[in-house]
Amino acid sequence: DLFKLFQTGDLGNIDKLDPEAAAKLPNLAQLKKALYSDEYRAFIREVTGCGELADKTDCACSVYAHGCHLLCHDDVIGTRRVSWIIYLSDPDEPWTEADGGALELYPLLDAKPHTPHVNPSARHLPGFNTCAMFTVTPGKSFHAVQEVFARDKPRLSIQGWYHAPTEPEGKE
């Protein structure tokens, strides 16, 4: 399978919860408000150089437990423009290479354009309160989440996509 993980529904719907349920999630509602703000979108544009962003944002929480993974892909679906991940793993138990669960970035094969290499060129461990982001580019933004080897140490994150007003050129 392309993936094995546990994921919530889209956090864009958090304001549609009944008041009793919403009262249990005030911090998540504040984070969603910040991530969806015009100011944060301007920051994303400045940092990534991604160009114009639409108002559309996707956002969900994910848990990768022992054995969970996400195979190599490029995130090109519809108008996705910037992929981002905020890591929320336990700060008292820093993530190590032995735990697995790294974000893997893949270079392209020289002989075959738009084809990722078999091996990643970089691995980034999910450090607490860190954010990874990259521009979604057809045939280039290949990445994966390495299988989680740790038995009692879940890889927790909030992740999503900022969208462009139109679909990218070169999308197949």
What do these predicted regions represent?
Residues 31-35, 40-46, 50-57, 62-67, ...:
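Active-site-proximal binding-pocket segments
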Residues 7-13, 51-52, 111-113, 125-127:
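Short, functional N-terminal and low-complexity linear motifs
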Residues 14-18, 55-58, 119:
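Membrane-targeting and insertion segments and their boundary/processing signals
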Residues 1-46:
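Non-heme Fe(II)/2-oxoglutarate
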Residues 4, 16, 24, 32-33, ...:
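Context-gated lysine
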Residues 59-68, 72-80, 87-172:
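Catalytic core of Fe(II)/2-oxoglutarate
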